[in-house]
Amino acid sequence: MTQWTDVAVLPSWWLCGWVDTDSPGYRTVSIGGTPYTAAAGYHRWPDYIGAIDTAVGAGSWAATVNNRGAVRLSGSSAAVVWTDRAGWLMGMGTDPADSEGSVTSVTSRTPPPGCIPLIGANWVSVDRTAESQITVDRWQRGHGYVWGSAELWRWRLRMVRDAVPSFRSGHLLSGKVTLTSTLPDPSWSDSPWSSSNSSGYLDGYVVGVEGGRWLGPTREVYEVDLLVATAVGS
């Protein structure tokens, strides 16, 4: 089976969540017995990794993102303990209090549930007059009701098999998300999408998920529609 780190085609898009570090949950890692905590804020994914990088930098470690979206923390040999769910969010496959032992680096073992790589993406505006009630997949337990002054979009996303569990794990199925074609590392710099900037990023709030399906008999590529609300004119 093809692994996400071995796919010949590099990601062309990323679906990234936002992370709240005002409260405990996804903000602290212990290195060499010292806890390092990301600065408080509501961070787009690249800024979140940047906040982690700044925090662990006090211990002479660094947080980076490779060209497939995997997060890597590295530095001098030290015991690494994930004191909260930051490790899980970054794809380390860990639970709170899990230890990596004494290491010089740790790298995402799965596509990070906080920001998954995509091998394709496109979007269309949803006609709210024709689609005032939208049925979503069963893991969302119900329907999305569309109302107010927001615009609704259907983002069609394609991902490799290994990214599907990370997508379904929940962080990207609610709250604010960003769709970007620029590598979401701490140096991320992009401009919003517009008619004159077709490669720009899109921000929105998840309303629901429609119709996941495998493309082809090998079940290596998965396609799903994400319903996203944006401010009028975004």
Task: State the predicted function of each range.
Residues 1-54, 82-115:
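Threonine/glycine-rich low-complexity segments that form extended coil/beta-edge repetitive scaffolds
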Residues 1-13, 115-234:
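Extracellular/virion structural assembly segments
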Residues 24-31, 71-73, 177-182:
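Short polybasic amphipathic segments
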Residues 28-30, 61-65, 80-81, 95, ...:
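Short, exposed beta-strand/loop patches in secreted or surface proteins that constitute
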Residues 32-34, 40, 72-79, 158-161, ...:
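Secondary-structure transition/turn motif
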Residues 35-40, 79-86, 107-108, 120, ...:
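Short amphipathic beta-strand/extended segments with alternating polar/hydrophobic composition
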Residues 52, 56-88:
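Short beta-strand-centered interaction patches in the first periplasmic/extracellular domains
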Residues 58-70, 96-104, 108-109, 178-190:
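Short glycine-rich, low-complexity/disordered patches
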